[in-house]
């Protein structure tokens, strides 16, 4: 089933028993986090808080708290297991778009043409008088404190926008970038835009600042987009395809877009049926910036974007289960807020796994598998355990063909997709190990690994700056473990033979099991 907007999706989830309305007053300060966290850990429904304490806007939480709801958001109506299979089909589609196979026949050529036509037909379309602009706040009416922005953890620096779909465009680019970056509230119309240096929004901003020094950089933030657009922003979409176009493929209909209203920001387009849209700029720094507080990291310097307004972000409780360090990021000044009538504020929290991003990671893991298999045909399965903060550890199952093969796969995974840039640990196992069962993975590590021979250490590599275990912020080491059976050339010893029961005996005991009534 396809959903034209967030409200359509909410209605469907409620009909399936996948959403619960909370009519009791619940505060966005800490209480929503605690309630959503308990419900998510129990595999419970999405929550629509109809009476957030002190606010007039309902709050939607735990929307993608199960793999089934992630699949539903992508248009797949199935149970958890079938949903994950369908997500692999989506990965195959992305793989075909990223690197199409050369056609071997007229039939194959026809399939490629059909796929190209489907992508072309899903080009976004512009609409006038969109629902997302039914209500407009301008001037003194622009006050972010009127929105029920969550404060998630006791040690957080303040309220935090968590599901903001940020729309940017680089200079001379027709394609808009969509990314989800958290944003700290620091004033009635000011947010800190926490985007890491390699993310699309940060790259667009740096390129703009380099080519247009001293000019304000336009940004729009969407709160409450339809599920296909939201999930498209967190999916590894090929660079040649816009997230809006990919959302159209998921939805089965073209994404409707509306131009922003603010002069200068009207070069950007946002989902026409979004709940709330923030329009504004990252402005150049006026005058000399105030010195950094004692003990704070130094202000950014040395590039064109450093000449724009920045502020210290954090600390905040993060997906690692810890509070992160403070860091400087650009300040986004909101000049206009547009919204639908009776707008819904979409929010989440991040914390020690499992949290909502970890569940999204489990679902998107299935999308990654076909992408990896397209590049590395020896990979038979791939798993990002949610306990590893969604991306910091990867377990790879492979069909090994020669000595050193596992190490080749390690470096291939680290370098293939941007999503694996921050993966610290990779464990490679053979086909006989179920990589989704920790008992089997640990058995393979403890019986097939020699720490000196089978450990690969790589120093001075890009690391998530939130990873305080690294000696330098943003730069650290990676480790690979070859837990495969060793081939000649990798060992001089006779390798152990796994114990297996005789097949005929197993069949006999299967029958006996039923007779005994065990």
Swiss-Prot record:
GO MF: 3-octaprenyl-4-hydroxybenzoate carboxy-lyase activity; metal ion binding
Reaction it catalyzes: a 4-hydroxy-3-(all-trans-polyprenyl)benzoate + H(+) = a 2-(all-trans-polyprenyl)phenol + CO2
Membrane topology term: Peripheral membrane protein
Pfam families the UniProt entry points to: UbiD (PF01977), UbiD_C (PF20696), UbiD_N (PF20695)
EC number per UniProt: 4.1.1.98
SUPFAM superfamilies listed in its UniProt record: FMN-binding split barrel, UbiD C-terminal domain-like
Cofactor: prenylated FMN; Mn(2+)
Binding site for Mn(2+): 177, 243
Principal subcellular localization: membrane
UniProt pathway annotation: Cofactor biosynthesis; ubiquinone biosynthesis
Quaternary structure annotation from Swiss-Prot or TrEMBL: Homohexamer.
UniProt family annotation: Belongs to the UbiD family.
NCBIfam families in the record: UbiD family decarboxylase
Protein name per the record: 3-octaprenyl-4-hydroxybenzoate carboxy-lyase
Source organism (scientific name): Burkholderia lata (strain ATCC 17760 / DSM 23089 / LMG 22485 / NCIMB 9086 / R18194 / 383)
